[in-house]
Amino acid sequence: MTEVYDFDQSSWYTKGSLAPILPTTYPDGRLIPQVRVIDPGLGDRKDECFMYIFLMGIIEDNDGLGPPIGRTFGSLPLGVGRTTARPEELLKEATLLDIMVRRTAGVKEQLVFYNNTPLHILTPWKKVLTSGSVFSANQVCNTVNLIPLDIAQRFRVVYMSITRLSDDGSYRIPRGVFEFRSRNALAFNILVTIRVEGDVDSSRGNLGMFKDYQATFMVHIGNFSRKKNQAYSADYCKLKIEKMGLVFALGGIGGTSLHIRCTGKMSKALNAQLGFKKILCYPLMEINEDLNRFLWRSECKIVRIQAVLQPSVPQDFRVYNDVIISDDQGLFKIL
């Protein structure tokens, strides 16, 4: 049985929207580089120099035989660094980077990025830029199938998204609780409905993910469980959620991210599941890759947030990442 409760609009009203990056061009048609700064926090951190940088641009030919042919739109998450440089200075150096791109494969298709340009202002992000980085292709590329293997490719930076980490305390992406299951527990999930502003056309993404310009995604917070395998009622869990005083915001971690801050009282068990952190970050890059790619430059805002209480999936249920077929003894079977 699933129970759904609505959060009050005041919990996301202040920071629940993202401004768009609208393409503008030079007279010759080239895109003009732009930077967007997002601050999803409350601004109570004394040192506001920590920021997350997300680069966006064109993956294009780098054979030097003529004007480069653009293959697809891509991104490069640089991660968190500390600097007092202005956003415009960071953008200028990013556009001068010579970032090579190579298509490869592991369990999934991947893209390899490495930079050949000496760093100055972007030195705090040297780990990703100078050591190279590998990402799942679906997370950082619109259409990986358009990237050739027989022609050298480079990533030309056009846009930069900066997320200021202005909340006091440490941020946490609660990966450890995503698959945590417990018998007779109630799973506490958050269902977010966002509205995309502007034109939603087939050239920018899959229209099937939108209904009336709206899309939803769900994140897992944790489980409510009692001792001796007894279950809480949904109404009791609702009271616990109300006491948490959750505040929501949209940020730019990995493209688009949901930030949740607990301003009230959290149960000891749930607090332990979350690593005793009260500032949570859920990048759509890890939750919904297709929706995240569509939102890289789009204007969007939260229109509804709901608490979803569902029975935790029993531990008896096996988690299958895929279906494997074995032909042992000449018979096909599903493992």
Curated annotation (Swiss-Prot):
GO biological process: virion assembly
GO cellular component: viral envelope
Localisation per UniProt entry: Virion
Example of a GO MF term: structural constituent of virion
Residues in the signal sequence: none
Keywords attached to this entry: Viral envelope protein, Viral matrix protein, Virion
One Pfam assignment: Matrix_Paramyxo_N
Main location: virion
Keyword Glycosyltransferase part of the UniProt annotation: no
Domain of life: Viruses
Family: Belongs to the morbillivirus/respirovirus/rubulavirus M protein family.
Function comment: The M protein has a crucial role in virus assembly and interacts with the RNP complex as well as with the viral membrane.
Name of the protein: Matrix protein
